[in-house]
């Protein structure tokens, strides 16, 4: 943790003789704290109501788009953190997209207690490192004036941040998907704790390397957002274990995503790079190309190079507890079905060959082998409006499936639930009357994220990993990247998990790894 004039420091009136006579760095060395740990100095030593710097995790926040800022707000309100640096290759609030035009700005104003705050830029939707710095600075000035906060530093390059901010304890990573793995690896190698938004990586091999780095450095506490879910997987497993639907055979999970464009052609125009955007840093490890707003902000998710598609976006919310409860590891077969787009080359139509963006709609089947606790099972993922066939139990009652949901199919019955396994109910089976439907806790995605923050802090204090670490997400990370590889190839894939290779379509193996741009490889980042 830093102790310089640029950071909030205790005033002399808050320190007694004992704490003044013992510099914090000397205190840390005396108790043998590691680079990945921090020391707690009881608040009563410093006075009533004082938040000791040693009580807080010094955090650098990397990625200040709309979702990044949305999740920054609950984090700065958690007194266990002190944000000391922000980073984004985009400086100004220009060209950002969001679910609506005003709600994020209003949330910012309420959080920082300044109802006149404006984002600058094009003055529509907040984003960029200038806004991030402004939010952090004004929050501490207006809400915690007792800290005498002097301001956080702002960087456009995360590598420079790591070089200069030697005393940060942790980072939170909210960049586009293609940078998640690289920045996580950079942090772990520097013994910085990591909170990273899903997916861990949009490449299978890269994700495996980051997970191995986390295994090799257990003192670094890691957390993948989202951890847990809104659902009731424990209830579902109790029903399955009791034989309520017989032997589980299939799981079906469907979403209304994407809610962003999935372009069927590459941009051909060449607009100017917006002032304040470092396009080279935004591209990062990927192949350089001309700037286009169709690549950036919300719509990056639809491109194989920059995003992970609908499953990477939403499957972590719905499937985390499913993977854990059913002990799903690596699938041996992946079967894609996907939409295509046609165009006219007058006077003839043709089908667009596309291996650069996710399809408008798809459903993908993952075949998982049996383990000691269950037989083999198939997992089906659907997006773009695709859904499984309406079960006879609903069809006979003139009902249909909701636009999002989850269905567990056994050889003697079915369990229907919401997308995140919430509000499950048995719709047919051998024990229709005995199970009791359980109410689910409903939390927004931002609420899910914020509920994990105290657990992350406790894990750092206790130097012990907790549920939600990136190692636990290994097989879900693998699945979302096999989803992308199967859609990109358009072919049934046979996967050899031990060797991390596709055995029947050799060309598809290139989609499992990244061809890193010079200076951006994961080995040297």
Segment roles from a protein language model:
Residues 193, 200-276:
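A contiguous active-site-proximal alpha/beta segment in oxidoreductase catalytic domains
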Residues 93, 154-155, 174-180, 200-202, ...:
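Short, solvent-exposed turn/loop segments enriched in Gly/Ser/Thr/Pro and often Arg
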Residues 28, 133, 159-162, 184-188, ...:
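Non-transmembrane alpha-helical segments in soluble domains
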